[in-house]
Amino acid sequence: MDAERLRAYLLGLPHVAEMMQWGANLVFWVGDKAIGGKMFALIDLYEPAPPSRAANQQPATSNQQLLLSYSAGPARYAALLERDGLVPAPYMARIFWVAAERWDVFSAAEWKRELHAAHEITLAKLPKKVRATLALPVAQQRHLIVEARRKLAKKS
């Protein structure tokens, strides 16, 4: 599995919006952020520079790049952290997010199951007003999103 395949899968889930945030992070939301959606997965697209070949420089091992973070939920969080290659997600561990250090932590089918579960967990936590908005026809949803973004732009 890789970032492009996971991106295609995530965008195929219901009510998913993507947004670039915090540098080179592709963040996936259940419902658009403008209408109160919540994020459920994040792919780090940052490509670190190749290590220096200087003889006196030690390779950096403590700053392992995390490829993908997602909402695991309280029920699965501890069990997932026992799996090699999964760690608590920085800044998000307190809300039961895990992060993958490698793409081969799961098979393609397992990745899909994990991210589908993250989507479902997050969808269930959305406020009633946001869920009601997501139940509207797509054209109405888009109109509400555009209006919400206009209001946010006026405030800033």
Please report, for each region that a protein language model flagged, where it lies by residue.
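Charge-dense, helix-prone N-terminal extensions
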Residues: 1-156
